[in-house]
Amino acid sequence: MHVLSVSSLKGGVGKTTVTLGLASAAFAKGLRTLVVDLDPQADVSTGMDIDVTGRLNIADVLASPKEKVVRAAIAPSGWTRGRPGKIDVLIGSPSAINFDGPHPSIREIWKLEEALANVESDYDLVLIDCAPSLNALTRTAWAASDRVTVVTEPGLFSVAAADRALRAIEEIRRGLSPRLQPLGIIVNRVRIQSLEHQFRIKELRDMFGPLVLSPQLPERTSLQQAQGAAKPLHVWPGESA
């Protein structure tokens, strides 16, 4: 089971949209996938068409990462209706904010790792949609991960946030989790004709070299349309998808 965190230390860069796109790609490839909705906004759970009735959620798991609790907080995505494949969601909740303090204990940081160990044989891939901060929830996600991808957009403040994120990943790798590595930087919401965007992409490449992943993701209405309809991007109709 490979665990990938999708992170950004700045809100509004399309982190959750990227998570949903990666989930759609994994589903299209037939990978048994679990998406962990760790962002207190819980938008992944909405975007993947989850029925939360009678189920526990990520806050319950962080309080008690036992197998019984973990399995009760996992629901199949509505994407699977009428389509083959396995893609589940560990349901998000605004209550997760209660576990996002600035100074988590070592015990708290390892709770998600403990929870995922209970379902390790069930999945090929785990995607974690992280909170847009560097508090306890993000550190908990990174401690449970093999790789982290950092989502940014080609703007001044977002470039600075990507730099902070990569420095923090290295800090966690050295101090807590030697297996953790950055997968790279996904540059999202690119307007190809924008000189400012071209400048910022060059700046990112100058700063981070091969960590800047290709291709960069242009702004596309199909992403918002698929997300708004709670459908996987890879089955969304039209050339724009």
Segments (PLM) and residue ranges:
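P-loop NTP-binding core
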Residues: 1-241
